[in-house]
C-alpha cells in the first residue's frame, strides 16, 4: 500500500528563478528541500570549501590537536582504530595519510567483524600495549566504548576519540537525560551537548577531515594539501547515508569534482575496474558501485584489505586488489539474495501475528550481511526490521528503521537484553545472548507505538507536472540539485492519466518495460518501468491510462537524443 503526498510549500518561485537564473521548477524543488532565504539558496547552488566551518569550533579539537602535535613531535607511536565499513575505512585513511605526511609515527588496526565485532575493545587495547603503542586515535567509533577506553587509560595509553555516532545517555528518575561520555583524554564528536560546531551531521570521515584541518593549521602547514582527500571523503559521506545538506553537500560536490583526477592509485584502480573513468561519476556510483566493494572487504574478509588498497603505491598490485574486491562484492550479492528469501518467509509470518517491529533470526546467515538484509525487508514491508544470526558468542545482528521510529532510542528502552548495542535513529547493531531473543522480540514490540498508517509507504511528490513541460534545458538544469542522497532526494514529478499507446518488453529477464505514452495535450514521450513483465501486465489488465510518478531523462541512442521519463510509482485507470 502506498500513500502519495504532494509538497505544497510556498515561495515566490518566479522571483527566485529570476534572481538565481534558474527555472521556477528548480526554485520550487529547492524550496521543497527546506532551503530558504538567499544565503541558503546561494550556498545550496554554489557552496564551496570556504563555506565549511572552522574546525576549532568543534568541542575537543583544540585539545586533541595539542596532544597530537606533541605526540608527533616526540616521535610517539599512534595507532588508529576505525570501524570496518566504508566510513571507517575512509576515516582511517584520512587520519593515516594526513598524520603520516607530516612525519607522524603511525599505524592502524581495523577490528575484525567476526572476531572483534564493532569498535574498540579490550583485546585491541591489550594488543596496543603489547606493541608498545603510546596513543590510540579512534575514528567512526569509540563514543559508546566507555569500558574499553577506561581499560586503555588503566594501561597508560593516551586515548583520543573521534566519532559522529549518537552519544549514549542515562535517564534519571525525573526522566532527564545525561550524556555518558567515554573517559578519554579528548572526545571529538559534534553531537556532544556542549559542542558549538554549527553542522553536527558529518560522517566519521567528515569529523576526521576537520580534525586534520585543525592539525595542519597547528603544525603551520598548508591545509590545501588535504584537498586530495576530498574524493575519499565524498565516498564515505554518501555511503554512510548522512544528510546531503550543508557541509556534507559541499564535501560531496567537491569530492566528485576531483575524483577523476585523483592521485590515489588504489581509488583509480577501483574506478577503472568498474569502467567509471570514462563516465560521469555522480553520488549513485559512489553509493552503489564503489562503496559496496569497500564494504565487501570488511564483510567477508578484513577491511584492512580495502584500506591497504588506498595505501598501495604499485599499480599492478592495486589493480589486482581492486578486482578481488569486486569479486568479493559479487559473492556478497549472491549471499544477500539468498538471505532475503529466507527472511521474507519469517517476516510475513510475524507481520501476520501483529508484530510491528520485525525481529528475524537467520542462524546460517553471514553476520556481515545482516544489515543489508534488514534494509531489504524494511524497504519491502515498510516495518522496522532486525536481522540476527549466530555469532561466536550468542547472536548478533543489525536493524534498519522507518520514518517515525528511532531505533537507537527504542533499543535504549530495552538495553538490559543486550550485551552490546549502538547506532542511529535509522540503523543500529546489537549483540545478545541467544536465550534473550524472544524477550527482545516481545519487549521491542510491546514498547512500539507505531500505528497501521505508519506502515504505508509514503511517496512524496515534488511537483504535479505534466510531461508537456519537460524540455532538454530543464533536464540539464536539474543537475544543479546534485548530488542526490538523504535529505536531498532525486526530484519526483507526477502526471495524472497518460494514455498508454504501446507496450514493449526488453531484457534477458523481461524486466525492462517501455511504454509509448501520450498526454491529453498531444505530447508523446516514452516511459520506462523496471519490473517483471508478468507482474506489470497483471496490474495493467485492460486499462488504457496510467497515472505515475517519474524523473525525466535524456535518452541517447545512435547519436539521437530524445526525452524520456523513468517511472517510479504508478497505477492504471480505465478511462
Model-identified regions with their sequence ranges:
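Mid-to-C-terminal polyanion-binding domains and interfaces
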Residues: 66, 70, 74-76, 317-321, ...
Amino acid at each position: 500500500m502506498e500513500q502519495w503526498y504532494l509538497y505544497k510549500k510556498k515561495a515566490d518561485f518566479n522571483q527566485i528563478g529570476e534572481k538565481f537564473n534558474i527555472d521556477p521548477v528548480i526554485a520550487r524543488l529547492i524550496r521543497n528541500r527546506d532551503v530558504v532565504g538567499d544565503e541558503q539558496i546561494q550556498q545550496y547552488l554554489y557552496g564551496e570549501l570556504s563555506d565549511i566551518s572552522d574546525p576549532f569550533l568543534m568541542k575537543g579539537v583544540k585539545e586533541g590537536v595539542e596532544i597530537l602535535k606533541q605526540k608527533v613531535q616526540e616521535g610517539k607511536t599512534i595507532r588508529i582504530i576505525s570501524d570496518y565499513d566504508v566510513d571507517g575505512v575512509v576515516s582511517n585513511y584520512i587520519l593515516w595519510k594526513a598524520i603520516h605526511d607530516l612525519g607522524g609515527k603511525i599505524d592502524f588496526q581495523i577490528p575484525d567483524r567476526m572476531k572483534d565485532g564493532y569498535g574498540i575493545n579490550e583485546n585491541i587495547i591489550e594488543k596496543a600495549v603489547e606493541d608498545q603503542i603510546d596513543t590510540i586515535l579512534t575514528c567512526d567509533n569509540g563514543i559508546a566504548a566507555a569500558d574499553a577506553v577506561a581499560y586503555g587509560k588503566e594501561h597508560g595509553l593516551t586515548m583520543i576519540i573521534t566519532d559522529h555516532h549518537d552519544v549514549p545517555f542515562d535517564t534519571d528518575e525525573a526522566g532527564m537525560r545525561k550524556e555518558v561520555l567515554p573517559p578519554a583524554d579528548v572526545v571529538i564528536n559534534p553531537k556532544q551537548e556542549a559542542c558549538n560546531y554549527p553542522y553536527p551531521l558529518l560522517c566519521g570521515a567528515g569529523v576526521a577531515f576537520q580534525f586534520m584541518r585543525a592539525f595542519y593549521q597547528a603544525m603551520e602547514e598548508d591545509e590545501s594539501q588535504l584537498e586530495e582527500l576530498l574524493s575519499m571523503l565524498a565516498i564515505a559521506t554518501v555511503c554512510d547515508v548522512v544528510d546531503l545538506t550543508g557541509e556534507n553537500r559541499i564535501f560531496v560536490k567537491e569530492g566528485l569534482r576531483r575524483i577523476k583526477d585523483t592521485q590515489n592509485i588504489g581509488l583509480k584502480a577501483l574506478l577503472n575496474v568498474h569502467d567509471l573513468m570514462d563516465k560521469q561519476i555522480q553520488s549513485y556510483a559512489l553509493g552503489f558501485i564503489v562503496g559496496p566493494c569497500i564494504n565487501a572487504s570488511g564483510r567477508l574478509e578484513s577491511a584492512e584489505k580495502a584500506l591497504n588498497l588506498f595505501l598501495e603505491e604499485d599499480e599492478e598490485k592495486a589493480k589486482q586488489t581492486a578486482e578481488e574486491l569486486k569479486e568479493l562484492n559479487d559473492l556478497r550479492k549472491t549471499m544477500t539474495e539468498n538471505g532475503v528469501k529466507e527472511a521474507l518467509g519469517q517476516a510475513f509470518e510475524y507481520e501476520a501475528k501483529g508484530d510491528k517491529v520485525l525481529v528475524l533470526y537467520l542462524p546460517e546467515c553471514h553476520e556481515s550481511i545482516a544489515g543489508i538484509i534488514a534494509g531489504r525487508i524494511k524497504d519491502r514491508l515498510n516495518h522496522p526490521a532486525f536481522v540476527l544470526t549466530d555469532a561466536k558468542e550468542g547472536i548478533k545482528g543489525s536493524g534498519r528503521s522507518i520514518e517515525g521510529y528511532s531505533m537507537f532510542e527504542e533499543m535504549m528502552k530495552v538495553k538490559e537484553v543486550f550485551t552490546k548495542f549502538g547506532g542511529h535513529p535509522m540503523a543500529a547493531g546489537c549483540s545478545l545472548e541467544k536465550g534473550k531473543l524472544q524477550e527482545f522480540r516481545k519487549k521491542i514490540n510491546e514498547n512500539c507505538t507505531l500505528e497501521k498508517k505508519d506502515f504505508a509507504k509514503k511517496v512524496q511528490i515534488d511537483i504535479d507536472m505534466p510531461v508537456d513541460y519537460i524540455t532538454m534545458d530543464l533536464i540539464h538544469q536539474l543537475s544543479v540539485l546534485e548530488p542526490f542522497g538523504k535529505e536531498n532526494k532525486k526530484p519526483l514529478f507526477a502526471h495524472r492519466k497518460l494514455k498508454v499507446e504501446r507496450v514493449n518488453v526488453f531484457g534477458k529477464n523481461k524486466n525492462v518495460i517501455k511504454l509509448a505514452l501520450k498526454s491529453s495535450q498531444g505530447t508523446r514521450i516514452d516511459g520506462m518501468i523496471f519490473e517483471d513483465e508478468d507482474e506489470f501486465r497483471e496490474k495493467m489488465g485492460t486499462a488504457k491510462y496510467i497515472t505515475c510518478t517519474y524523473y525525466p531523462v535524456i535518452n541517447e541512442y545512435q547519436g539521437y537524443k530524445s526525452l524520456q521519463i523513468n517511472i517510479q510509482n504508478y497505477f492504471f485507470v480505465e478511462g
